[in-house]
């Protein structure tokens, strides 16, 4: 087992540890050795766009676009989603994400962007008005504001920093319910249900 504390939020064994106020995260997390799901590639897919998103540049107010589509080698039994990322100076990067190897309890933002768009394509009825990715980002932004996690929607860490996205949804579920914000509460339930299929 590979034990590290490098930019990992979430513990696959114990989702989160709280004090009586439910606002203290455990001081370190255990990261299981993962099958690599991401690969930076040169081949460009010409498939239909599944969804779009944006990443922030921490050095400026500029946001850069990203798009998800199926990779050319993707199949029904072995889905692979290609993520296109636009970067400063008109640079473009492409990442292939093997959906069968993504673990939402220990995943980067890039992996989750690919997974959410795949889920919405396969189960359109569960995507909500704006899609799973937008729902998850809203929850994540609230979790960051509450001090439960840190921002991984940045150019410098979206492909490297892993978080426990199921743990984040479960944590925010309590906050939303307590505040009477039932739409986001329901989003947390739906996302946890969908993500559990990939753990």
Predicted feature residues:
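Type III/flagellar secretion export determinants
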Residues: 1-199
